[in-house]
């Protein structure tokens, strides 16, 4: 090694150590002038020896040539958003759910319950990013994006001073994805805006916008000039576990050079969490950065895994938001808009006012119950808040300023769009097998797809990227199609002719043919996409995937009883009833029939087949008895009944003596009384019959999964696949019992490598793992009876 190489390595190590002490420990050991001298020496040596410059050198933070666009990055583990709490009662409800999910004893709603340990830290108001390290070196930075797909901003994150280009120390996993927030301090924000003003450039409304705009610059030299900082708050994919607790993980990351929150704290129980929230709230204005709340996470990693996730958020974490900034203004009018499901909702038209740096002239009123709760009248002076710092909301009426000519807000008797009758429907709450009428009500236009507003929103949803994905059908085009009476339902899209399209504004020969081709190309949708496209109330993309993966066919989804639907992951009784009601509706049946009829629209659904293996294996007699919500009978007692009698009919017909052999007197009496009610017995039998008609049987206990050909195996997908998406490939592997992981390790059984496979394929070859190309993978699936 030459003297220059040796000195360059020494300088890099020394500068990395000083960066760590300055940005992470806040304990600088040399003056800034000495740091600058060392930095200049390294820069000069690298200029003399450009062949020795590496991407992890401290000198590489200055930015490089501008990009034309960012490339997309798929997150192997989705970057989910957090659920929100706005009041103390929301936090106590979260704590109750955590205790319930961990099967811990919980007190009453305000009693604190069991003392679960939570990590606490301020919720920085910035931009969420993912940093991927391979063997301790930063190889990629990405934005959160939609949680599944983000943008590759690697060249920009390298310019953020306190992000280590190379980890300190040793002992880190080979693959380590760090997640955190890039933000701008209040002081940095003020300096940036002052500089922008002086240069005649654009100023930013708030530090968050400044941070987001700076990080997404195509010219990384601009990013390098901005006062950005990073704070780590968690992990994504890792090739090996680090610690048993969330705080333990963060402490290890700090040792490796990652900046973590100086306000990080452990709280025992919900009351300590609330104390922390109040303390941070009192200090909020004094903190050097903007925050919009506090994040609480169950500290135990094992407990986090046990609690798992909802469709879009973890069950083990929550963001307790601070009250947003508020302003006074005048309510000029209340107008009514009609949504996709026909709900008629009020919208406040306001005297424009600035709230948190944004001019607000409209605000949500949610529903007429909210209008009544507020006691709102047109002409009132109201307090406007940006709820969650995003959606403007009317939160209070200043009644002492009410003018004499103030007018009450009245729901229209007929739809403001189509003139159809507006009906009031009382809301019904369903829980644990019981229905109760709630105080709330919803007003709906009964015009359905005859209502232009509902039809437009339904079509916009139907053609959207995550639904049928029909390119070229923008909102304005859909408005034209509806206004010109060219479509009256989603099925009419597939009946459009060239002559009709070319007459639309903005269309010519090429664009008309392109749209017709896009419509034709959408005729073979995956089952999950089709279900999502139908616009079933409360059924989002993730729930649609669960329905498709678990039930395997549209016919089963259409037939499923609400009680059977609750057997699916994350489908509660409310959503189950919405799904069931949607498919019971004769108009919806007609539209679906037209879409699927070969002599009409001719859609052919893909990925239909048998019941999902995990779903089939998860439904047992004991589980079914538990889900009947028999009073005093929990999972343990339900399993005792299943073990004793072996069939539902056996439980229903059991005499008192046999029942007492299985259960204590109180529980036995509850079971007997439950099934003595003919309606309960008939419902239980109907559920059993449907489950069995779907292909399930009580012998399909968990052990059935173990009988699947890939049970216990871990597979990895890498590169691009040409015959199917990676999501589809993942579903097919999971149907055979495999676990699909995001990283390669010695425990990986097989790697499926498509074109463009990189480090994962190299790692697989290094470890001597089995590797299949796409052709071999398709043959493997065919051999195991999985359609491709």
Swiss-Prot record:
Domain of life: Bacteria
SMART domains, alphabetized: BRCT (SM00292), HhH1 (SM00278), LIGANc (SM00532)
A Pfam family it matches: HHH_2
Native source species: Pseudomonas fluorescens (strain ATCC BAA-477 / NRRL B-23932 / Pf-5)
All residue ranges annotated as the BRCT domain in the record: 705-788
Binding site for Zn(2+): 415, 418, 445, 451
Annotated residues for binding of NAD(+): 32-36, 81-82, 121, 144, 181, 297, 321
Entry similarity comment: Belongs to the NAD-dependent DNA ligase family. LigA subfamily.
Alphabetical GO biological process terms: DNA repair; DNA replication
Protein name: DNA ligase
Gene: ligA
């Amino acid at each position: 090694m030459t003297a220059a190489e040796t000195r360059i390595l020494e300088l890099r190590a020394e500068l990395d150590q000083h960066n760590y002490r300055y940005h992470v420990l806040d304990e600088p050991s040399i003056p800034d002038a000495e740091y600058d001298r060392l930095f200049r020496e390294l820069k000069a040596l690298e200029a003399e020896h450009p062949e020795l410059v590496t991407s992890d050198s401290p000198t590489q933070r200055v930015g490089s040539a501008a990009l034309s666009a960012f490339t997309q990055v798929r997150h192997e583990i989705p970057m989910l958003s957090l659920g929100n709490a706005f009041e103390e009662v929301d936090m106590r409800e979260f704590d109750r759910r955590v205790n319930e999910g961990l099967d811990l004893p919980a007190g009453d709603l305000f009693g604190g319950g069991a003392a679960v340990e939570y990590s606490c830290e301020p919720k920085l108001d910035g931009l969420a990013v993912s940093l991927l390290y391979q063997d301790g070196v930063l190889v990629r930075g990405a934005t959160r994006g939609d949680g599944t797909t983000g943008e590759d901003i690697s060249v920009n994150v390298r310019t953020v001073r306190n992000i280590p280009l190379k980890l300190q120390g040793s002992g880190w996993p080979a693959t380590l994805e760090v997640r955190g927030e890039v933000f701008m301090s209040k002081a940095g924000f003020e300096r940036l805006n002052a500089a922008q003003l002086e240069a005649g450039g654009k100023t930013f409304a708030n530090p968050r916008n400044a941070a987001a705009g700076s990080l997404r610059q195509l010219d990384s030299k601009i990013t390098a000039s901005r006062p950005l900082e990073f704070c780590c708050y968690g992990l994504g994919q890792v090739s090996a576990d680090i610690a048993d607790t969330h705080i333990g993980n963060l402490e290890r990351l700090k040792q490796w050079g990652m900046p973590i929150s100086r306000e990080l704290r452990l709280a025992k129980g919900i009351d300590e969490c609330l104390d922390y929230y109040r303390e941070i709230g009192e200090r909020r204005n004094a903190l050097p950065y903007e925050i919009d709340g506090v994040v609480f996470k169950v500290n135990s990693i094992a407990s986090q895994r046990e609690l798992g996730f909802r469709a879009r958020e973890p069950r083990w974490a929550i963001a307790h938001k601070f009250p947003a900034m508020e302003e006074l203004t005048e309510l000029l009018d209340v107008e009514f808009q009609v949504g996709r499901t026909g709900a008629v909702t009020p919208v406040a038209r306001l005297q424009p006012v600035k709230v948190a740096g944004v001019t607000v002239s409209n605000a949500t009123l949610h529903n007429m119950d909210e209008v009544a709760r507020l006691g709102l009248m047109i002409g009132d002076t109201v307090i406007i808040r940006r709820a969650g710092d995003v959606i403007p909301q009317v939160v209070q009426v200043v009644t002492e300023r009410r003018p004499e000519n103030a007018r009450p807000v009245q729901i229209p008797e007929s739809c403001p769009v189509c003139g159809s009758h507006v009906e009031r429907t009382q809301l019904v709450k369903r829980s644990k097998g019981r229905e109760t009428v709630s105080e709330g009500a919803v007003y709906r236009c009964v015009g359905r797809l005859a209502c232009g507003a509902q039809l437009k929103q339904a079509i916009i949803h139907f053609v959207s990227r995550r639904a049928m994905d029909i390119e070229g059908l923008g909102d304005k085009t859909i408005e034209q199609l509806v206004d010109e009476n060219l479509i009256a339902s989603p099925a009419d899209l597939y009946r459009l002719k060239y002559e009709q399209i070319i007459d639309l504004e903005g269309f010519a020969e090429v664009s008309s043919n392109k749209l017709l081709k896009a419509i034709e190309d959408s005729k073979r949708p995956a089952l999950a996409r089709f279900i999502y496209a139908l616009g079933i109330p409360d059924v989002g993309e993730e729930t649609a995937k669960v329905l498709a993966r678990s039930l395997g066919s549209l016919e089963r989804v259409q037939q499923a009883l609400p009680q059977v639907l609750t057997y699916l992951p994350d489908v509660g009784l409310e959503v189950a009833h919405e799904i069931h009601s949607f498919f019971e509706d004769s108009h919806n049946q007609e539209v679906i029939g037209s879409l699927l009829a070969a002599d009409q629209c001719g859609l052919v659904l893909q990925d239909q087949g048998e019941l999902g293996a995990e779903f089939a294996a998860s439904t047992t007699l004991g589980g079914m008895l538990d889900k009947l919500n028999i009073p005093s009978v929990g999972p343990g007692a339900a399993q005792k009944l299943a073990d004793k009698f072996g069939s539902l009919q056996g439980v229903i017909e059991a005499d008192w003596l046999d029942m007492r052999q299985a259960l204590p007197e109180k529980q036995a009496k509850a079971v007997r009384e439950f099934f003595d009610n003919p309606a309960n017995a008939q419902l239980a039998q109907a559920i059993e019959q449907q489950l069995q008609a779907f292909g399930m049987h009580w012998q399909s206990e968990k052990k059935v999964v173990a009988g699947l050909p890939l049970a216990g195996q871990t597979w990895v997908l890498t590169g691009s696949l040409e015959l199917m998406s990676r999501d589809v490939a993942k579903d097919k592997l999971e149907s055979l019992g495999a676990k699909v992981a995001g990283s390669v390790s010695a425990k990986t059984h097989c790697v499926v490598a498509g074109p463009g496979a990189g480090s994962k394929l190299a790692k697989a070859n290094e470890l001597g793992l089995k590797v299949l190309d796409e052709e071999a993978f398709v043959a493997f699936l065919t051999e195991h009876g999985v359609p491709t």
